[in-house]
Amino acid sequence: MATGLTLAVDIGTGFTTAAVAVDGRLEPLRLAPDGPMRAVVSLSHDGRLLTGSAAADIAATHPDRAQPCPLQALENTDQVQLGSTVIPTIELIAAVLRQVVHEATRHSAGPPPAQVVLTAPVRWSGAEVDRLRAAAFRAGLTNVTLLPEPIAAARWQADPAGLRPGSTIAVYDLGAATFAATILTATPGGFEIRGEPGGNPDFGGNKIDDILLRRVADRAGKTDSRAWNALWADPSPSGQQLHTRIRQQVVAAKEALSTTTSHTVRVGGSVGDVEITRADLEASIDGELRATVTELIRTAENAGVRPGELAEIFLVGGSAQIPRISALLLEMSGVRP
């Protein structure tokens, strides 16, 4: 049996998170100043694949050289074009894994991890799993275990003393690109998937960003429609950089509104500032969020579980932190996340 450092990695559609096992306990690994590492991978002008904040900086000025969601790219295709260069998608994931291993090794001040646990989307088939394994091998990782994302989330969040074997839980996972709903049964050794996982592969945090951006555009247009339309139609490099900056502010607004009731998006020029409130956000996406809760309930019922029989609902994914989601889950299922 391998000994030494164990590293757990979750490459999400928006961010990559990781943890290391220390004395039998998992400790979160800081991959960026604010914790998780952005999922984006970019090609530098000297041909290197960059990850994290360095990749995000390139994406802001040269979006054609960036892949914002390498995990989704790995699922959908064998290769992508960054700038004028064709890159195998397994190389994108390998670049992310190399960076995570580097941070884990620096954190532990010892040898590289002896064991690596990688999460994989629960809906993935053998082909996608094989590509993920190939990416890990390309990154120099040989002792790799793959774990379905909802099981990994349950292991991370569950209180071992609070769940009896046979208890049923739900995992509500709203990532950057997709929504997944999974029902799990607690076992003496962990968790098992119960029934067929559900979800929506076309709805995630990115769609929420799009909806919120339209709300900002509507407000900006009412202030100075001519200036806003000219700004958003500007195809120049500086115009594209401004578009990226505004979109980044919209994403920041969505994240901030999980803990505050209002946030300002600074457009500049004659448009000035646009204030967005939590009520604005919730009103804009209420129908979409209700649909995700309905899908979670449908998934549970198809697995033979009534919502009231769920012992827990675990929230996973950055956009799952939107307060309205917890309120809707309690309202529609009777279970408080």
Name what the model sees in each region:
Residues I93-H102, T292-R298:
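Short, acidic loop-to-helix structural element flanking the phosphoryl-transfer center
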Residues A104-S108:
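Transmembrane alpha-helix boundary signature
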